[in-house]
Amino acid sequence: GKCSVVCPVGVEGDKIRIAHRSRKKYSIAHDYSLIDEGKFIGSMTEKRRVLYFMGCMTALTPAIRKAVTAIMDKAGEDYTIMDGDGGICCGRPMLVAGRKDDAMEMIEKNTKIIKASGASVLLVNCPICYKIFKENYSLEGIEILHHTEYIDRLVSEGRIAIDRSETKYVYHDPCELGRGCGIYDQPRNVVVAAGTLVEADVNGKESICCGGSIGSLSLGFDKRKALTENALKHLTCGSPDVIVTACPLCKTTFNRYSDRPVADIAEVTAERLI
């Protein structure tokens, strides 16, 4: 996404890459037959106001799920979890891989589940999932919120309170959430409510990728590590105590090489709830 932002002639490299991959899709031997098995549907027996979709990466980082549900419990939210048993994909990895037909089939199946839930809010904490829900799903009448938007709203409405500390936090803008969806202010509002915000010397739409991008699968380990270390160098220039992000993939990637704690914004919020 950053190439498209900084390109002086406005070439949208990310869209070109996906279009090129879609031309190669039939030469790639992957099995997506699981979308016909029905096993990924999960079970929702009760209708709630908020439908929480964790996504694949949050299923692999359960501390984020625990924090998000703790926040909803504290706010007295009426919610259920769409993929509490795991196994549901939003479809974006297939779309980015050029498997548009398979992605659209997944989107169609997920749309039926979401609409049948009766929820008025779809809560998502993975920016990759959030972007496809906003851009490729037809969910009229259902508000789609990233958890940074949701937490910021809970604080502003007085539904939760955060005990502010002297901790210095630096916030990392995930590619898909910032450049991809334009969400910059809400997460910073939450961080400021929890402690002192120290900005990285490169942030916002210029933010550096964590190195875990699913859109650059051709990059080898050494190049990905170099990207991560470069991002950490810029994030830690102000000597923060904690690195905060709002993407489970970013958190996992930074944790491999960071010399200080890395936390999701939901974890920062949950541990300081009053």
Label the model's feature ranges.
Residues K2-I274:
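Iron-sulfur cluster-binding electron-transfer modules in prokaryotic oxidoreductases
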